[in-house]
């Protein structure tokens, strides 16, 4: 069980051991409830057909919300980044989840991400601005430059400001930093 917990992101050997020992001390019905919740989440949660965010419905709550601006599209690497931006309550547009970042060293090319769907979406919809909210790293910069080249013929492209430390992950940034990063976005040259 410890080995399984260690496979989770951000869980080291000591935390994995602590979690395993905690579960072993729980009543059997609580362990069954926990296991059932995991299995239910895995079988009931998929991806939104529009933005590729996690959703129990074919179209997620954000994409269905008529109060969200259809003219603004924020591109993120994964759902954790989307949730981090949502916590700021500063952004009222829609999203597109790539499913990762271009990383040739890890064997991840553009064709492995939701990039072709993004280009089709931007070309077909009335999107006035695409905001690239990608981690400030080599992979994030590479992906941003690649996307900017593809999307500029269709719409304005900006990137969130570099208020985030280089090499950091979006999901760990505090709400104020993310809010300022959104406010300070600029056009990609």
From Swiss-Prot:
The keyword DNA repair is annotated on this UniProt entry: yes
SMART domains, per database record: TOPRIM
Keyword Zinc-finger in annotation: yes
Residues of the signal peptide: none
GO biological process, one term: DNA recombination
A Pfam family the protein falls into: Toprim_4
Protein family (similarity comment): Belongs to the RecR family.
Protein name stated in the entry: Recombination protein RecR
Organism whose genome encodes this protein: Synechococcus sp. (strain CC9311)
Gene: recR
């Amino acid at each position: 069980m410890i080995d399984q917990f260690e496979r989770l992101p951000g869980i080291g050997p000591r935390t994995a051991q602590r979690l395993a020992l905690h579960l072993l001390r729980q009543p059997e019905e609580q362990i069954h409830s926990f296991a059932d919740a995991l299995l239910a989440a895995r079988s009931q949660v998929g991806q939104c057909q529009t933005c590729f965010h996690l959703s129990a419905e074919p179209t997620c709550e954000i994409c269905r919300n008529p109060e969200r601006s259809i003219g603004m599209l924020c591109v993120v690497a994964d759902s954790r980044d989307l949730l981090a931006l949502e916590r700021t309550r500063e952004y009222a547009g829609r999203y597109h989840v790539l499913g990762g970042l271009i990383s040739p060293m890890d064997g991840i090319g553009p064709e492995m991400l939701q990039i072709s769907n993004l280009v089709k979406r931007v070309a077909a919809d009335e999107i006035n601005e695409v905001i690239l909210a990608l981690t400030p790293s080599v992979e994030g910069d590479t992906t941003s430059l690649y996307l900017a080249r593809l999307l500029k013929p269709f719409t304005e492209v900006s990137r969130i400001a570099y208020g985030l430390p280089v090499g950091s992950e979006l999901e760990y940034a505090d709400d104020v930093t993310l809010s300022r990063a959104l406010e300070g976005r600029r056009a990609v040259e």
